Curated annotation (Swiss-Prot):
It is an enzyme of class 6 (ligase). The gene is hisS. GO terms for cellular component: cytoplasm. Pfam families: HGTP_anticodon (PF03129), tRNA-synt_His (PF13393). One of its GO terms (biological process) is histidyl-tRNA aminoacylation. Homodimer. This is Histidine--tRNA ligase. It comes from the Bacteria. The keyword Lipid biosynthesis does not apply. It comes from Rickettsia peacockii (strain Rustic). The lineage of its organism: Bacteria, Pseudomonadati, Pseudomonadota, Alphaproteobacteria, Rickettsiales. GO terms for molecular function: ATP binding; histidine-tRNA ligase activity. The keyword Cytoplasm applies. InterPro entries: aa-tRNA-synth_II, aa-tRNA-synth_II/BPL/LPL, Anticodon-bd, Anticodon-bd_dom_sf, His-tRNA-ligase, HisRS-like_core, HisRS/HisZ, HisRS_anticodon.
């Protein structure tokens, strides 16, 4: 028996109804981004693995467990992109765009992570991605956060989300804090989860967002990052809060919201929802001023960005999206097909969506048309062809018209 072929586990086909929703989400988000000056760009789905090794660090969960990396036929290690930010910064450097800063980029497309598939978490999924590169300061962060809010508002899900906000401080703040955190956690080393024991030596700040109940009890009394802010870090965060209040952006400060990599600084944020169970984050981002230099640029480049999961957005709200319903042209006999093709071509040049139904018996063709919930059918038989006119049936109004092409056009464009 021939094996029934299926997509890979955790990867799904996007059928027309799914694609319609994805398209709506992308177009809506793109339109909001345009109002903020963002321009769309794309990068290859496949990059050298070292692009992500540099950006995420080999000890990160994505690199150590989730990345799709393999040796290609040129004996190079390449990877399916697990996120956009590293690709965008790689593009900035390889295309020598530094002299054009600041730049605002919007990207969208599939990303890949080898994870345990579940609702809202697949191995291939799609993201909206925004990067504001070359601009520093709390005003830039506030503008980016307001963009995220406006996108969620345009998608009618803002009311279902909470903005969780934190400041990672400057490098000096974080360095002192990390030392104090490790000192504290070392006293509980034997009680930490297996995952957190590994992180303690490689990426201790990531322990703060552990989901383990045991870890959570230990973290509850851990030192708080804000206690180690320098004056600069305090002023930066206070300024951001002031701007968000002016803009009317609601937020909740979460001191455990962190980014475990050294190039992140100051603002970190997530928009979460209670509608998706454990997969509660639908949009997340932060400031990453140190990434460009790590990836080979001569200097640091200030930058902030975020990504949102399209599949998760689609799970929060059911979108009823209207679409253009095509007009169906039904030639009665084979001898009417040539005339029908002429009519179809003329109507399409007038931007009218047309499907010609010429296969099978009339009854079966009519059934297919009814299944499409069409409004108009154009019947073309010998009489219509001889008189150079069209018989149009309006299925919603249950009316029938025999008209010339000009009148038909007027009727179909109403």
């Amino acid at each position: 028996m021939t094996e029934k072929l299926q997509p890979l586990r955790g990867m799904k086909d996007l059928l027309p109804d799914d694609y319609k929703v994805h398209d709506y989400i992308i177009n809506t988000a793109r339109d909001v981004g345009v109002l903020y000056g963002y321009k769309q760009m794309s990068t290859p789905i496949v990059e050298y693995t070292k692009v992500f090794n540099r950006s995420m660090g080999e000890s990160s969960d994505i690199i150590s467990k989730e990345i799709y990396s393999f040796l290609d036929k040129s004996n190079d290690f390449v990877a399916l992109r697990p996120e956009f930010t590293a690709c965008i910064i790689r593009s900035l450097i390889s295309n020598r765009l530094q002299h054009k800063l600041p730049l605002k980029f919007f990207s969208t497309g599939p990303v890949f992570r080898y994870d345990r598939p579940q609702a809202g978490r697949q191995r291939q999924f799609h993201q909206l991605n925004y990067e504001y590169i070359g601009a520093k300061g709390a005003i830039t962060d506030a503008d980016t956060l307001k963009l995220a809010v406006d996108i969620l508002k345009a998608l009618e899900i803002e009311q279902d989300t909470t903005l969780e906000l934190n400041s990672l401080g400057c490098n000096e703040s974080r360095s002192v804090y990390q030392q104090k955190l490790v000192e504290y956690l070392n006293d509980f080393k034997d009680q930490l989860s297996k995952e957190s024991k590994i992180r303690l030596s490689k990426n201790p700040m990531r322990i703060l967002d552990s989901k383990s109940e045991t870890d959570q009890k230990i973290i509850a009394n851990a030192p708080v990052l804000s206690e180690y802010y320098t004056d600069e870090s305090k002023e930066y965060f206070e300024e951001l809060i002031q701007y968000l209040d002016i803009l009317g952006v609601k937020y909740s400060i979460n001191p455990c919201l962190v980014r475990g990599l050294d190039y992140y600084c100051h603002t970190a944020f997530e928009f979460t929802t209670k509608k998706l169970g454990s997969q509660s984050t639908i949009l997340a981002g932060g400031r990453y001023d140190g990434l460009a230099k790590i990836m080979g640029n001569n200097d640091d480049v200030p930058a902030i960005g975020f990504a949102a999961g399209i599949e998760r957005i689609a799970l929060i709200r059911e979108y009823n999206i209207s679409e253009v319903k095509p007009v169906f042209v039904l030639p009665i006999g084979k001898n009417n097909i040539c005339y029908a093709l002429e009519i179809v071509d003329k109507l399409r040049t007038e931007n009218i969506a047309i499907i010609i139904e010429s296969l099978g018996k009339i009854a079966k063709r009519m059934q297919r048309i009814f299944n499409e919930n069409a409004q108009f059918i154009i019947f073309i038989g010998d009489e219509e062809q001889a008189n150079n006119n069209l018989k149009i049936k309006d299925l919603k109004k249950e009316e029938e018209y025999i008209v010339d092409f000009a009148k038909a056009l007027e009727l179909l464009k109403k």
